[in-house]
Curated annotation (Swiss-Prot):
GO cellular component, one term: plasma membrane
Native source organism of the sequence: Cicadella viridis
Protein known as: Aquaporin AQPcic
Positions occupied by motif NPA 1: 85-87
Membrane spanning residue stretches: 30-50, 61-81, 104-124, 142-162, 173-193, 216-236
Organism phylogeny: Eukaryota, Metazoa, Ecdysozoa, Arthropoda, Hexapoda
Length: 255
């Protein structure tokens, strides 16, 4: 019996059943692809051909990203969880809310969606207004280690909120999740745009990097920072804030 339970738990962690349930997995992957595509298309569309130094532009960009993500959470949250961000997927992976194989597929389609969204923006935007397609880059004077810490910190805030929203002990959320996530995104953008462009999302940075020109300088910052921040936030929430009840029917996996 113990051996059978161990095998079943291992299968859940790896996600064999998730992948073999083809109808469900394809719906989830389609939702993640379309969600990330729209995030990048609408979000980065708000900052093509503008100077980030303009104060009103910073507010516009922050609100656009916050609103589009809140919209996507409402649209596809019930389908795939609306990760649309590899850092979110990694943060939920370490807390057992998603299996390994499913997480890998999510990250792949998120990157594909981001590339497609940025490509569409490039096609529909006149050349004189494209700029860098809202590619994230470090501001003058911001070193890669500084950028890494900024991205890790703001992503920590986002994933801590996501973990709270996903906590199955909470019964008081109602329909607040989209608003909460949107506000967190807006807040972090307002704080960090002038440092790193406020990515918090490797796919969001990857799409414009693929479609733009001369755009890979310090790109690692936008993968390492958010993923580290997301993983640390996931571990922190699970260790400090998520109650462990012996009688509860856990919806997560024990690693």
């Amino acid at each position: 019996m113990a051996a059978d339970k161990s095998v079943d738990n291992t299968k859940k962690i790896i996600g064999i059943d998730d992948i073999t349930d083809t109808k469900t997995i394809w719906r989830c992957l389609a939702a993640e692809l379309i969600g990330t595509l729209l995030l990048v298309l609408i979000g980065t569309g708000s900052c093509t051909g503008v100077q980030i130094s303009e104060g009103d532009v910073v507010v516009r960009i922050a609100l656009t990203f916050g609103f589009i993500i809140a919209t996507m959470v409402q649209c596809i949250g019930h389908v795939s969880g609306c990760h649309i961000n590899p850092a979110v997927t990694c943060g939920l992976l370490v807390t057992g809310h998603i299996s390994i194989l499913k997480a890998i597929f999510y990250i792949i389609v998120q990157c594909v969606g981001a590339i497609a969204g940025s490509a569409i923006l490039k096609v529909i935007t006149p050349a004189e207004f494209r700029g860098t397609l809202c590619m994230t880059s470090l501001a003058p004077g911001v070193t890669p280690p500084m950028g890494f810490l900024v991205e890790a910190c703001i992503t920590f805030v986002l994933i801590l909120l996501v973990q709270s929203v996903c906590d199955d002990r909470r019964k008081n959320l109602g329909n607040a999740a989209p608003v909460a996530v949107g506000l967190a995104i807006t807040c972090c953008h307002l704080a960090a745009i002038k440092y790193t462009g406020s990515s918090m999302n490797p796919a969001r940075s990857f799409g414009p990097a693929v479609n733009g020109d001369d755009n890979w300088a310090n790109h690692w910052v936008y993968w390492a920072g958010p993923i580290v921040g997301g993983v640390v936030a996931g571990i922190t929430y699970r260790a400090l804030f998520r109650a462990r009840k012996p009688e509860e029917e856990a919806s997560s996996y024990d690693f």
